[in-house]
A protein has these predicted regions:
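Structural recognition of an alpha-helix C-terminal capping motif at a helix-to-coil junction
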Residues: 50-60, 64, 72-84
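A short, charge-rich alpha-helical start-of-domain segment used by transcription regulators
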Residues: 3, 15-39, 49-52
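Amphipathic, Lys/Arg- and hydrophobic-enriched alpha-helical face
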Residues: 28-48, 64-65, 132, 184
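Short helix-capping/turn signature of helix-turn-helix
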Residues: 32-34, 43-44, 144-151, 161
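Helix-turn-helix DNA-binding module
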Residues: 133, 137, 141, 149-166, ...
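C-terminal edge and immediately downstream basic/flexible tail or linker adjoining helix-turn-helix-like DNA-binding
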Residues: 1-12, 17, 25, 154, ...
């Protein structure tokens, strides 16, 4: 990243330059989408101990390529970068077998009115996370982006670089597999 912006650091771009405008445009998306990228990476299996670093790397890689990203494609580019980065982190985690305790960002942000409600919500989240972990990555990515992050089929197709019809079929398969997985887990099976 330092090489890409070395000239820009020596000679700051004028506020009207294409680089400055692209950097500002991408910077707004990066700021707005931080939590989305964090959750996406976590749900794609990036270990909890690495998810903050992976999020920052995805954001930095996107900013470093700001000149190459077309307007209105910033979010898709950022999510695609995060998607590809998740493979790197999962590969590294498999090699090191470092499995830390799961920390759910939503749990840190909410307070339940009763201990029973909080416990049930935590159990539901753990069940969902375990069921999601059983899905193949390509199904988990589509389901997470659509159901949990609210992206459209077109946006998902762009992020994952697959046809829109493939998004629909993977979503249908993912929902079916998730339903079966949740049912098995509730019955106490594997």
């Amino acid at each position: 990243m330092a090489l890409i912006h070395a000239k820009a650091l020596r000679e700051p771009p004028s506020p009207d330059s294409a680089l400055a405008q692209a950097f500002d445009r991408i910077g707004e998306v990066v700021t707005r989408e931080y939590a989305v990228v964090w959750r996406f990476l976590r749900r794609l299996g990036v270990p909890p101990s690495d998810v903050d670093d992976a999020t920052h790397i995805a954001l930095a890689r996107t900013l470093a390529r700001c000149e190459r990203i077309a307007p209105d494609c910033e979010r898709a580019y950022l999510m695609r970068t995060a998607y590809h980065l998740s493979f790197e982190y999962r590969r590294a985690a498999r090699r090191s077998q470092d499995r830390a305790a799961d920390i759910d960002v939503d749990q840190l942000e909410t307070h339940e009115s009763t201990p029973d409600a909080a416990l049930q919500k935590q159990r539901d989240r753990e069940l969902l996370d375990e069921a999601l972990d059983q899905l193949p990555t390509e199904l988990r990515a589509v389901l997470t982006l659509y159901e949990l992050e609210g992206m459209t089929f077109t946006e998902i197709a762009t992020v994952l670089e697959i046809p829109r019809g493939t998004v629909a079929s993977r979503l249908r398969r993912a929902r079916g597999e998730l339903k079966k997985s949740v049912s098995r887990l509730r019955k106490g099976g594997c």
